[in-house]
């Protein structure tokens, strides 16, 4: 017997089956950076239409977590897809480098500034700490395969960026959006500083809920506001009853708020006459243990407006006022109002010119001049407040209530509202809020619900307190008059001079600046502001300090490109998306972005938030070290980012399985392109075998669908389409069918080269389509593809060598779709025969297809090549009417199938069973087509 193995076109490639990504990827990274891949991308795309995805800066503290990885991978996928769409899409990563968390870390090492270390030295230590954190995070981000300006990122602590933040503040002031006021802000007594909205978390807290009687200054005057419902108006002091869960704020009470249209009742309760909202009377009196009451009179809230009541323990008279926020859902319908400790209280207090009282120091302790409560921390003062109220017979009820309460996101401790002198961006000054709401309409929000979410937040947010009392932050570089508290009239011009100094020496330049340097003889009249900016102002103004300044964003016209997209987690509607919007509106009166894409949070396999305490944290470093970055990237792409993103070892292993299918498909393509040179061996479209033309056309459909999915940021659709194509169109159909032709046809024949041409087209398209997601693997494939090409796939564009089926094709796309169904039914019949031991494999079988006229016409079009599609040694088509009773029914209407074992001898080269085996004396073991493929011109294939 002869050995014909050497006559076969066996697959051969250096592309390994085992990916070994964890070991291979770091070497590929070295190659990318030693060959300046990112620089080559920029050079290749210079002058093209720009796409700017502006990076929201992560905080420079700690290792990156899985959420960071999701965010950076999503950005990288989108940018790489835009690059392949021939956009110039630079990516400048950034870091948020100022603020309290860094201060706290440095304090642990060197102590608080002003004690063991000077403020200047403390800032230097903070800068050094942040730089080390940036280096650590940058290393991990690069390991993810994310390409960008890693050697020149933007840092909010860069001297130039700090200077530009000051310039941004100057523009806000110039456009009249800044004001100073004593206003209640979220205040953390642990931080000793105001908190931004985004720095507040809500957790359950147990608080005293108390009902307090405020006696009327003039009983008769108050009674005259009511309409009697009985002949008797009762007896005893008249009191309005308030309900509060913050007893410690009662020293700052300056009013009782009522609802204008709500009905209030005057009720006799023992020796008192109490004013309570009618709908709440029964619940309140039950709470007081006095259910034997009678209603004496009623009135509306508006009837009691400006009536005076006595503060329960201070020598004060407080008015009844009207407020829209008063409801009768709980409490008494009479709301304790302390303008110094609540935003609603403050707002209504402005209308009634109420005092904004605050007796609480920065550390949460009542000041020494506070009557009754001096030296007590506010939360410890609650019990003392109850004692004072009880002594004055003003406490009607006290219970413990578990309720949602604001906490500091860093310390996880309860915070307070506290009026302090602060700097604010005024939401309703110069129509900032209204203009922002209008501009939101012009932005594309992905998912669409993001629009409504940010609209509600902008509608309801208070003025933005942008000042902080910290050491490590961009200073508010202002001088205010010592007597009038007014800004210096030349503030904007002076801020530019200060910014120039900061560009050279950093923010320390402000602290070192002697006022006389700028103010001259006026220095004695002005006070230098010592506050720093909220870090959300730092990051929120990067549209002005980075996008509007970096040369990478400069167009050939000399103009600066605006950001096309901001992409962050869903918490940033209240954070960076909003701070960026408000500062951009205040500076430029337009949104800083055209599109905003939001992704969900990462949860574990049980849908639980990841936390160290639960032991369910998934480290991206561990995933990369075990499975490789491409598996992590594939998981991100496969997950619908618009909701919570679930990850677990099991889920990542499923991603690894999907990856293996893609890799094996790619390996098959490369192995069967062995010996193929596209410059000499590429077969013209019209000369290709019909099946090959069809798969190229299917690849074009895939490419169009995938590009459309990339453009709509439907990355999980990209994943689904790619994996389906590799598994179904290729793996289960096309690649299965062509193995015979690929391996056995004459090497330089049209039948073989047509097949290789199709594989080449598929590989050229697939490698590009997968590149944004499977960046390392795509680069590995790219390096092994035949033909001249760019050094890296990322400098190219989508493949343009694909084509559609022509209108005069003998087998249309619909015909091939029908054939896939027929083949699936034949496979079922073959499997039954195998299980019954009637045949060993498909090539031992001869099939008879009993078909309706319509299906028969399709099948006979393939002539003798139908057997190659079905991967059997023989295939006959007969009329449906001739079908024997034992023919197998199928799910294809008008088709029955019979399978018999072939009696013909087996060809030792192609393994087909053919009658002509043994007829050639030189090659008695071979069938006729194998003889032709070895010694003749090679077999001719038209269809398959």
Swiss-Prot record:
Query: Motif location ('KMSKS' region)?
Result: 609-613
Sorted alphabetically, which SUPFAM superfamilies does this protein's record hold? Anticodon-binding domain of a subclass of class I aminoacyl-tRNA synthetases (SSF47323), Nucleotidylyl transferase (SSF52374), ValRS/IleRS/LeuRS editing domain (SSF50677)
For this protein, the Enzyme Commission number is: 6.1.1.5
Q: Which Gene3D superfamilies match?
A: 1.10.730.20, HUPs, Valyl/Leucyl/Isoleucyl-tRNA synthetase, editing domain
UniProt GO MF annotations: aminoacyl-tRNA deacylase activity; ATP binding; isoleucine-tRNA ligase activity; tRNA binding; zinc ion binding
Q: Where does L-isoleucyl-5'-AMP bind?
A: 568
- Reaction(s) this enzyme catalyzes, per UniProt: tRNA(Ile) + L-isoleucine + ATP = L-isoleucyl-tRNA(Ile) + AMP + diphosphate
* Alphabetical keyword list: Aminoacyl-tRNA synthetase, ATP-binding, Cytoplasm, Ligase, Metal-binding, Nucleotide-binding, Protein biosynthesis, Zinc
Annotated binding of Zn(2+), by residue: 907, 910, 927, 930
Query: How is the co-factor bound, per the entry?
Result: Binds 1 zinc ion per subunit.
**Which residues are noted in the entry as ATP-binding?**
612
Subcellular location(s) of the protein: Cytoplasm
Q: What class of enzyme is it?
A: ligase
Cofactor(s) required for function per UniProt = Zn(2+)
> Can you tell me which family this protein belongs to?
Belongs to the class-I aminoacyl-tRNA synthetase family. IleS type 1 subfamily.
Q: What does the function comment of this entry state?
A: Catalyzes the attachment of isoleucine to tRNA(Ile). As IleRS can inadvertently accommodate and process structurally similar amino acids such as valine, to avoid such errors it has two additional distinct tRNA(Ile)-dependent editing activities. One activity is designated as 'pretransfer' editing and involves the hydrolysis of activated Val-AMP. The other activity is designated 'posttransfer' editing and involves deacylation of mischarged Val-tRNA(Ile).
Task: Kindly state the subunit structure of this protein.
Answer: Monomer.
Recorded protein name is Isoleucine--tRNA ligase
Query: What lineage does UniProt assign to this protein's organism?
Result: Bacteria, Pseudomonadati, Pseudomonadota, Gammaproteobacteria, Alteromonadales
The gene name reads ileS
